[in-house]
């Protein structure tokens, strides 16, 4: 082997090591802070799944999670339940109402008189609002609540219309259906979606999914599991009863071990904890 070939092999080996090291996301004090994702918006300070709740998150630099349902005439709306009973001044199923009929619903007074006449927003309106904050690096998690074989393409079309497809992450139980994932991927290969894992056994299956770029865990994963997710080039999004409440110890664990995003009802409190963590570094 001549000197030139030897030199090239050394350089190549150095580059391989550098790439492998770069793929290992740091943990502990060097771990970047996770993104805050407000559950249905700033849920403790404004009515869930409304523009007021989402705007509050955007102003604070938080991401948010939103739910997707459809009206009788096919419009995509932001609503968690299948009925309007809990979060408006009327009763009934959303699928029995047209988009026009939803306009008069009061989706804010149930929470506080200050939010009287907040409406059930259309997904088009929500995406437009996100687009109005182009400098935000937050994550906007889309939880598809229906499975009608057309919703995935419709969502991608709206996201691309507003130029925010790369800022959305598709999550939830519906996305566990392989056909839903395939339709999202067919709509646009740049779609970011997460496979759900409720425990360590499911994490193995979720990591093996070739179409997903994130793992959506609903338990507190071990440091080794978090490292494994990152080693495979994916990111980890945590939700569920380990982080949804005001759970400072679990939040601190996620911060220390490099979880990428935390979905919580207590976005403001988590924000304060992240600021303290950043200041202490």
Q: What is the role of each PLM region?
A:
Residues 7-17:
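Bacterial N-terminal signal peptides
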Residues 53-70, 209-215:
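Catalytic domains of carbohydrate-active enzymes, especially glycoside hydrolases
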Residues 28-30, 127-135, 156-163, 181-188, ...:
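Acidic (Asp/Glu)-rich catalytic clusters
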């Amino acid at each position: 082997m001549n000197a030139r070939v030897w030199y090239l092999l050394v350089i190549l080996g150095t580059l391989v090591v550098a790439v492998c090291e770069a793929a290992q996301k740091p943990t502990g004090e060097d771990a970047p802070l996770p993104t805050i994702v407000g559950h249905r918006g700033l849920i403790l300070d404004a009515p869930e799944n409304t523009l007021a709740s989402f705007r509050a998150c955007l102003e604070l630099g938080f991401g948010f999670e939103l739910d997707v349902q459809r009206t009788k005439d096919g419009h995509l709306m932001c609503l968690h339940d299948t009925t309007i009973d809990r979060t408006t001044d009327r009763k009934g199923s959303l699928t029995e109402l047209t988009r026009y009929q939803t306009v008069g619903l009061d989706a804010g007074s149930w929470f506080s008189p200050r939010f009287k006449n907040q409406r059930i927003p259309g997904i088009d309106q929500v995406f437009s609002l996100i687009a109005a904050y182009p400098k935000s690096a937050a994550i906007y998690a889309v939880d598809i609540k229906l499975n009608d074989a057309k919703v995935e393409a419709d969502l991608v079309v709206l996201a691309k219309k507003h130029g925010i497809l790369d800022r959305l992450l598709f999550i939830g139980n519906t996305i566990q259906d392989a056909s839903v994932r395939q339709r999202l991927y067919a709509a646009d290969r740049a779609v970011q979606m997460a496979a759900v894992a409720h425990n360590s056994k499911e994490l193995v299956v979720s990591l093996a999914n070739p179409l997903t770029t994130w793992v959506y865990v609903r338990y507190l994963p071990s440091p080794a599991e978090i490292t494994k997710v990152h080693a495979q080039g994916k990111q980890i999004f945590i939700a569920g009863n380990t982080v949804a409440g005001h759970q400072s110890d679990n939040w601190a664990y996620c911060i220390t071990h490099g979880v990428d995003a935390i979905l919580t009802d207590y976005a403001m409190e988590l924000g304060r904890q992240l600021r303290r963590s950043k200041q202490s570094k």
